[in-house]
Curated annotation (Swiss-Prot):
Keyword rRNA-binding: no
Protein name per Swiss-Prot or TrEMBL: Bifunctional protein GlmU
Function: Catalyzes the last two sequential reactions in the de novo biosynthetic pathway for UDP-N-acetylglucosamine (UDP-GlcNAc). The C-terminal domain catalyzes the transfer of acetyl group from acetyl coenzyme A to glucosamine-1-phosphate (GlcN-1-P) to produce N-acetylglucosamine-1-phosphate (GlcNAc-1-P), which is converted into UDP-GlcNAc by the transfer of uridine 5-monophosphate (from uridine 5-triphosphate), a reaction catalyzed by the N-terminal domain.
Positions of region (Linker): 232-252
Region (N-acetyltransferase) residue spans: 253-453
Binding annotation for UDP-N-acetyl-alpha-D-glucosamine: 10-13, 24, 77, 82-83, 105-107, 143, 157, 172, 229, 318, 336, 351, 362
Species assigned in the record: Rhizobium rhizogenes (strain K84 / ATCC BAA-868) (Agrobacterium radiobacter)
Catalytic activity: alpha-D-glucosamine 1-phosphate + acetyl-CoA = N-acetyl-alpha-D-glucosamine 1-phosphate + CoA + H(+); N-acetyl-alpha-D-glucosamine 1-phosphate + UTP + H(+) = UDP-N-acetyl-alpha-D-glucosamine + diphosphate
Amino acid sequence: MERTCLAIILAAGDSTRMKSSISKVLHPIAGRPMIAHVMEAIARTDISAAALVVGRNAEEVAAAADIGGIEVEAYLQKERLGTGHAVLAAREAIARGYDDIIVAYGDVPLLTDVPLRAARKGLADGNDIVVIGFHTENPNAYGRLLVKDGELIAIREAKDATDAELAVTWCNSGLMAINGRKALDLLDRIGNSNAKGEYYLTDLVEIARSLGGRAIAVDAPEVEMTGCNNRAELAFIERLWQERRRHELMLSGVTMIAPETVFLAYDTVIGQDALIEPNVVFGPRVVIDSGAVIHAFSHIEGAHVSGTATVGPFARLRPGADLADGSKVGNFCEVKNGKIGKGAKVNHLSYIGDATIGAGSNIGAGTITCNYDGVNKHETHIGANSFIGSNSSLVAPVRIGDNAYVASGSVITEDVPADALAFGRARQEVKLGRAKVIRERALAIKAAKKGSH
């Protein structure tokens, strides 16, 4: 029979060092609130339920933590009286009697399921407390994990440690797993006889041992345990996240010429043999198929780029952009909610919004779809193998048929049938010698002005 597990995520801190009007766990990493990153790692740990301990921005934090797939209940911590007190805010959930309890924090967005699974295995092996630790070259103020014969004896805070204990480089991350059947009894024994009058979760190690239980520590990569308390650490974590994800994509077959200049979102999908040139930014909900080419300085969000399609340089794809095989969106072009058909080309200086472009069509430089009338958006439909001349304005709603031509500089306000040629501009007139008259008059005016000074 599988063991049941409750995950308790502590996210009630005041976030004072973040200097922000919102809780720090709502700040994004790779376009997603950091609490959602934590929840994703927890969801991969085969848990039964999750209890979210909230304080500031309680409703917003609860909403951000609801990533789907797991049941999340929010519990309000009215006072900030330490980590032990925070865990007991979820007393109702703990009392349901799970086999395992995992305690995690909402501000460790680089967390993966691997150390959480290791902690659960430690409980399955008969331990009552399993602390997740990490080795570091700079232990500084971290609590030290004191281990003897494979058993965790205590967690010693740096300010209370001896010189020998300060030499220990295995440190407490704050994350731990607790025997769920004993959890309430152990948690209720935590006292607050300390300088701050708070209830510390770390006391569980010695409490469990005093009752004949056993505590151990398991190791995790230091990077996964990186917490966020201020904007500098937020930027540092963003960098670490980006480095990790870029590396994963390159190992999967994606080419990045200058990976350090490419920025990904939490859900960016890029297929094998895609080429990403320098200085490309991906927002959420982007899928790049195998073989696509994204040229330098492009910004892509909410878009799909099929294989053999090319984007950029200096292109922007906004939500709803969908490029078919062999299509091209070139330099200084923007596509929003636009479907670009197979082999179609939007090469230069164009805006395509709320539009469909048929296979093989060519959109000339400077063409725009005029999709907004000041109140509502309207659609433009261009058929297959059509040619839109440069500097044309297509005023939606409008349809242009297959194999149609639109003359350069046209303003198109009515539908154009298939195979038709449409002009939407004044006819050119040539007046011989008129330029000379205009120039001489202008020069005379200029000379008169000089003479008056």
